[in-house]
Amino acid sequence: MTELHPDLRENVRLLGDLLGQSILRFPGQDCYDRIEEIRAAAKADRRQESGSGQRLVKLLGQLSDDELLPVTRAFNQFLNLANLAEQYHGIRRKQGHPSDLMVESLGEVFDRLKSGGIDPQELHRKVADLRIEFVLTAHPTEVARRTLILKYDEMSDCLSRLDHDDLMPGEREEIVDRLSLLIAEAWHTDEIRHERPTAVDEAKWGFAVIENSLWQALPKFLRSLDTSLSEATGQGLPLQVSPIRIASWMGGDRDGNPNVTHEVTREVFLLGRWMAADLYLRDIQALRAELSMWQASDELRAEVGDSREPYRQVLAQLRERLIKTREWAEASVKGEPADDSGILFENEDLTGPLELCYRSLMECGLETIANGPLLDTIRRAHTFGLPLIRLDIRQEASRHAEAVAEMVNYLGLGDYLSWSEQERQAFLVKELKGRRPLVPRNWQPSEPVREVLATCEVVAGQTPEALGSYVISMASKPSDVLNVILLLREAGMAFPMRVVPLFETLDDLKGAPDSMAALYEVDWYREYCSGRQEVMIGYSDSSKDAGQLMAAWAQYQAQEKLTEVANRYGVHLTLFHGRGGTVGRGGGPANRAILSQPPGSVNGSFRITEQGEMIRFKFGLPRLAVQSLTLYTTAVIEATLAPPPVPKDEWREVMDWLTERSLRSYREVVRENPDFVPYFRQVTPETALGKLALGSRPARRKATGGVESLRAIPWIFAWTQMRLMLPSWLGSDVALEQAAQADRLPELREMMQGWPFFRTYVDMLEMVLAKADLRIASYYEQTLVEDEHLLALGQSLRQRLQGCIERLLELKQQQTLLEQEPVFAHSMKVRNPYTDPLHYLQAELLRRDRESEGAGKVPELVERALKVTMAGISAGMRNTG
């Protein structure tokens, strides 16, 4: 087993010691001793020392209500500090540890592509045309409070400063003192949110990720891309090219979230402009100090006359307009009268003066100055624009159909919802080709329809740079897309917006290619979309609907066929991947996922959701963000120029054979076994999850109901908390078992060797199985389940999990899980003694919580400690839902 890197081990030890000092100061020695005793017992239990498990459970059982909270908080804080140390270690560039970075450089990938026969001109063209868009979403998975995240970020900065070998003893002591203070502040800060964030709060957090990290990271990354591209092809990155885009669902995603109204969306658009103006003002102030030179081109002189400081004069005018823009946005947010004269609204208002200065400096031979901070600001302006972030709108298809139906009914044209698809399309295309407004002025729509129309009006008032995609969930036919375009036109939309159908259930994925072919058959629409189309693939719901193996295969086939259909109609397709942080929701290492997409499906453009806590893990610190941007960019370029081979027909047959068995066995348990939902409710903390104020979105679509009413995120969260990890392996166990019985494992090994898609699936399954824990799952059952039928189901599921592990080891010809991932294996080994006590405590607290609820009152300390265990286990697992 690979040990932790000495530097990482030293950082974990330092942070743990400083946390211990905080605990010694408060609550004091007795509590500290109790925590140490529990930690020692948990370590002994993991070493399988005789009687240590019973001793651990006994120690935890003896905790009084008053001791519960400090003990759970101590283990939660340690796991957060361990995450922090690991996250920092991933970006450490300390001399002698180049392997720590674990990301292939842009130059290495470009060289490999050229060695493989890619022409440098083709490489340059593909990079210049690259379009990678990250869509930040606030799914309720980020457990850590923003207050603490800021403290953790500064702790990471302290670790970075400690990495300098030339520190004087006094300097080192000063940094350690600051670290000690930050850890003490974190220890005395309540780590649990007690009120749900609003949709606007979530959007502000998205803006904060840009301000604190991406604002610095993006120009740094683009400099590196420019240099590597220039070295590889002889040409740098064109000035106006922005291969990276940042979009967001925070404040725009109203699907299943009644808290996101048109007022919220309008406020988020305005807040984005306010924040952007503020950030650009800081840049312009710094540039005014830099650009003091007097040489200028005739073009610039024509703009400013004989000024001795022509650049400063241009920047002073820009500064005045940015101040006006910020004041206008602030007044508009508050609902006060706002003067919009002289504000910056279109992107050219910002990029024009900056590029004028750039051209002048280049013409005067001042390239070094032109390519300094001015270039960084221009790159930011082309990436973030004046709106700062591109806001997506998401709404369910039936809401648009109902709006059109009310309109049609009011005009006396018939019952739209009873029309056939062909009748709907004929009506919509006729209206879209015409010029007349459809909505009469005196019409009074119902409240739900009024809200849909008001949202369309807010969207129509934006510039193209402020908008991402209009995503339609539950879309299945061309009229679903045409409804939205008509409603936007009625609202006054002056330019075509991307309208994106989302396919997420198994049936949706299977029907997606035919649905898109029918849409491309509409001549008017092909002209509207100008040969470009985006389609969203949902990973979470398909996995919950069909099990992970069937979902992964359905997603792969849908992407293949969608690409074929788009090519047939001469349409450039961008696939928008609605992935989560966990394997059960399509998560996993990004570069592996991209490189295992069907050949031809990436094609220079890639759009992906970054959800909840994964935003922090990937983009939370500037150096981390540069690393993530590099990783995605190299993978997208490679998948575009050197895609994986087309899978053999016999491999497809094997996948059909496997998934037929996995789907049947998954649904037999999840859909058809009457004991399953009661078992799920009793053995997991699902019902208590509603108490965690995680996000603005309700955890359920309906107040009651089975698994289908539960959102995909709490569904995964609940199983992760008690370590059965069921959504990610159920069904695969039977498929692998029957493959072994049919002597088909050699075929599967051949597929692993030659097919990145299948290899990635098997590797992700192994990672999930390594996080599962049979003993802990069994303890939850013993503590929380009494019904014999439910206990029998639990025993059967645990036996199936054990069987899945055995079959996977046989397939990979390994003795233990994660043999080829020693760093990850050791990370889990280090975390387990800290996570185990939280699991045992959580099961006990759930029991007390349920008993107290039955008696009518849950003690506050029990409820708070229960919330802390959920947060701590999430930190230990490095993900939630």
From Swiss-Prot:
Keyword Oxidoreductase: no
Keywords from the named record: Carbon dioxide fixation, Lyase, Magnesium
Catalytic activity annotation: oxaloacetate + phosphate = phosphoenolpyruvate + hydrogencarbonate
InterPro entries attached to this UniProt entry: PEP_COase (IPR021135), PEP_COase_bac/pln-type (IPR022805), PEP_COase_Lys_AS (IPR018129), PEPCASE_His_AS (IPR033129), Pyrv/PenolPyrv_kinase-like_dom (IPR015813)
Pfam families: PEPcase (PF00311)
GO molecular function annotations of the record: magnesium ion binding; phosphoenolpyruvate carboxylase activity
GO biological process per UniProt: carbon fixation; oxaloacetate metabolic process; tricarboxylic acid cycle
Superkingdom, natural source: Bacteria
Catalytic residue list: H139, K544
Documented EC number(s): 4.1.1.31
Keyword Lyase set for record: yes
GO cellular component, one term: cytosol
Cofactor dependency: Mg(2+)
Family (UniProt): Belongs to the PEPCase type 1 family.
Annotated function: Forms oxaloacetate, a four-carbon dicarboxylic acid source for the tricarboxylic acid cycle.
Official protein name in the record: Phosphoenolpyruvate carboxylase
Name of the gene this protein is made from: ppc
